[in-house]
């Protein structure tokens, strides 16, 4: 397959380079990433003409073509798909992010936003994030999980009408201690560290069986996302409210 790799940590980040080494073995890979660290940039895009500069760079130990872009992660995803990939990218993989993107933090994440931008460009995508706060982390473990998700997803998901974004979060544990992969919804709790610090029982919080819930228990978490922001639950009520005579 023809893949685009991007991130928000920048073209020189370890995560994207480890990801490239794993994926370029059996796929055609193009790398397009910000020239500098862009974490927390959300879905920001560049609107001023001429401010985006694309420069080809050589990454040590990587055979794939790589491009440094003076823009945001969302810029990189769009330029990668539309311009560098000539609208012939089969899938975009964003990451590996230095740190989790769990719960509401996904809204602030440049890594997740790049994946969503790919879906807006009608290209399925996977955002990959790794817990690095434990200190003894290994990007190779996250890359292996990403490759596993990619392999299953590309072969078995046939609904081409759905521009799906998958968000994968991998805990900071040795490979043999990760309990497995859980497909789950995204939680709403703000910042995982708050939960750790408070020491509250998870059964008492609203994130049961969410991405936060599972990674705290040693699982990798996989959540399907979409960019339709409509609140369908109250859409009819609001319509009735404003059409009453």
UniProtKB/Swiss-Prot annotation:
Cofactor binding annotation: Binds 1 divalent metal cation per subunit.
Binding site for a divalent metal cation: 8-9, 39, 97
Keywords: Cytoplasm, Hydrolase, Metal-binding, Nucleotide-binding
Ranges in coiled-coil conformation: none
Protein EC: 3.1.3.5
Localization terms from the record: Cytoplasm
SUPFAM superfamilies: SurE-like (SSF64167)
One Pfam family matching this protein: SurE
Regions that span the bilayer: none
Catalytic reaction annotation: a ribonucleoside 5'-phosphate + H2O = a ribonucleoside + phosphate
Example of a GO cellular component annotation carried by this entry: cytoplasm
Cofactor(s) this protein cannot do without: a divalent metal cation
Class in the EC hierarchy, top level: hydrolase
Family: Belongs to the SurE nucleotidase family.
Described purpose of this protein according to its UniProt entry: Nucleotidase that shows phosphatase activity on nucleoside 5'-monophosphates.
Protein name: 5'-nucleotidase SurE
Origin organism lineage: Bacteria, Bacillati, Bacillota, Clostridia, Eubacteriales
Name of encoding gene: surE
């Amino acid at each position: 397959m023809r893949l685009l790799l991007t991130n928000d940590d920048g073209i020189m980040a370890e995560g994207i380079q480890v990801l490239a080494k794993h994926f370029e073995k059996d796929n055609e890979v193009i790398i397009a990433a910000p020239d500098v660290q862009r974490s927390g940039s959300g879905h920001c895009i560049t609107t001023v003409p001429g401010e985006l500069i694309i420069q080809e760079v050589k990454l040590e130990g990587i055979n794939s073509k790589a491009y440094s872009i003076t823009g945001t992660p969302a810029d990189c995803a769009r330029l990668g798909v539309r311009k560098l990939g000539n609208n012939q990218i089969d899938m975009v993989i964003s990451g590996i992010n230095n740190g989790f993107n769990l719960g509401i933090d996904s809204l602030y994440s440049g890594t997740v936003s790049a994946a969503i931008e790919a879906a807006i460009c009608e290209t399925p995508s996977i955002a990959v994030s790794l817990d690095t706060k434990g200190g003894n982390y290994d990007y190779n473990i996250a890359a292996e999980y990403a490759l596993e998700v990619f392999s299953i997803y590309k072969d078995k998901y046939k609904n081409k009408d759905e521009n799906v974004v998958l968000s994968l979060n991998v805990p900071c544990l040795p490979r043999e201690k990760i309990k497995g992969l859980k497909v789950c919804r995204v939680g709403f709790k703000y910042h995982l560290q708050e939960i750790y610090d408070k020491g509250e029982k998870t059964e008492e919080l609203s994130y049961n069986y969410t991405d936060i819930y599972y990674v705290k228990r040693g699982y990798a978490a996989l959540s399907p996302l979409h960019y339709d922001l409509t609140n369908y639950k109250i859409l009819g009520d609001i319509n009735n409210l404003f059409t009453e005579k």
